[in-house]
């Protein structure tokens, strides 16, 4: 079915109402959320003497885009439900369809608005929010969360091709790896093996201090060279952060940094790569939901109801929260190795796309 795609007053009208309502709802809800968040964290702020400037500029200025993007599906759905229900209640949609505009053609400005919001959300996800998360997470670590001793156990990495590092345990308090081992392998043959009672990272000189070390080099003629000593300094393609993985850290990587991290983790055989893959797929899956929830919202609210817009808004909020919970629940399939991150994180979009198609077909034409 062909229809005229040239911009009309109707398109400008719907796009303006969509975008305006979206941002008004966004900032109203964010204001309420900030009030509740302050009341929840005020004791931490006072107890740990957080400066007012840090609270405002380091935390809440960076908290707003994070929260705004995380709940953007909810805001999109409520926006579409609200102003479309209002249009239906005022018989505007009936008037539009009576003028010869098809239901499909009426959807064009909705899809265009959803595309603008999706592009805005994607830009935030890939480049802006990761930088703002650095300050937000640093603030939470310093003033909100309880400080605990970070200990990594049985850490094993391929730090470079043919070079493997192992530590029985690692303490972030003193940057020390215990029972440290470094192996170098070439052509499936062990070339050398270094063991040390401890490996301490010197933050000033950026070197690892291997204490009570033992070095064994394996030669092709089956003769071994053995050395030992109290301490030796060396540089390794290994950082303190590699020993203790904080899943929140992936939120601070922009698109290109996250791809580099994933490549590095895959090369190392790092099991924590699942967190990075979840983050990467989530950044693309979430903006795409703007299209799905927009179609669902129009299909649900374009018909005039006797009860007014209350039922539509209630149903919209319920479906939006169901989608968000489904997005979070789908991550469990990755943690349990049931599904790959790409399938698990896109599963809610697939399911809700089917629902959107069914609702759209049932909507008034």
Language-model segments: which ranges?
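Hydrophobic lipid-interacting interfaces of membrane-associated proteins
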Residues: 215-218
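N-terminal amphipathic/hydrophobic interface segments
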Residues: 196, 228-230
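Transmembrane alpha-helices
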Residues: 1-161, 172, 189, 221-223, ...
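Structural signature for solvent-exposed beta-strand/loop edge elements and short helix-capping sites
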Residues: 159-205, 209-213
């Amino acid at each position: 079915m062909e229809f005229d795609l040239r911009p009309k007053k109707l398109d400008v009208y719907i796009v303006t109402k969509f975008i305006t309502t979206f941002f008004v709802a966004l900032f109203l809800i964010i204001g309420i959320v900030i009030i509740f968040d302050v009341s929840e964290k005020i004791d931490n702020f006072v107890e740990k003497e957080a400066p007012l400037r840090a609270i405002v500029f380091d935390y809440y200025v960076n908290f707003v885009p994070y929260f705004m993007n995380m709940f953007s599906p909810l805001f999109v759905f409520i926006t579409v439900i609200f102003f479309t229900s209002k249009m239906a209640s005022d018989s505007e949609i009936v008037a539009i369809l009576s003028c010869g505009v098809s239901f499909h053609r009426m959807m064009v400005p909705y899809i265009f608005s959803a595309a603008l919001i999706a592009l805005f959300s994607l830009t935030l996800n890939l480049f802006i929010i990761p930088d703002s998360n650095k300050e937000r997470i640093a603030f939470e670590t310093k003033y909100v969360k309880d400080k605990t001793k970070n200990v990594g156990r049985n850490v094993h990495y391929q730090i470079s091709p043919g070079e493997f590092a192992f530590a029985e345990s690692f303490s972030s308090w003193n940057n020390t790896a215990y029972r440290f081992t470094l192996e170098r392998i070439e052509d499936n043959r062990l070339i050398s093996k270094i063991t040390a009672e401890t490996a301490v990272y010197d933050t000033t000189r950026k070197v690892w201090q291997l204490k009570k070390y033992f070095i064994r080099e394996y030669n092709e003629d089956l003769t071994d060279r053995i050395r030992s000593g109290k301490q030796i300094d060396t540089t390794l393609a290994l950082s303190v952060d590699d020993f203790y993985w904080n899943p929140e850290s992936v939120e601070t990587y922009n698109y290109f940094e996250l791809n580099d991290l994933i490549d590095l983790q895959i090369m190392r055989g790092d099991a924590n790569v699942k967190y990075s893959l979840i983050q990467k797929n989530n950044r693309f899956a979430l903006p795409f939901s703007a299209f799905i929830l927009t179609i669902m919202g129009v299909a649900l609210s374009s018909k005039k109801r006797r009860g007014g817009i209350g039922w539509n808004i209630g149903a919209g909020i319920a479906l939006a929260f169901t989608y968000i919970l489904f997005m979070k629940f789908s991550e469990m399939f990755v943690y349990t190795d049931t599904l790959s991150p790409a399938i698990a994180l896109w599963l809610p979009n697939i399911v809700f796309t089917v629902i959107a198609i069914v609702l759209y077909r049932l909507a008034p034409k």
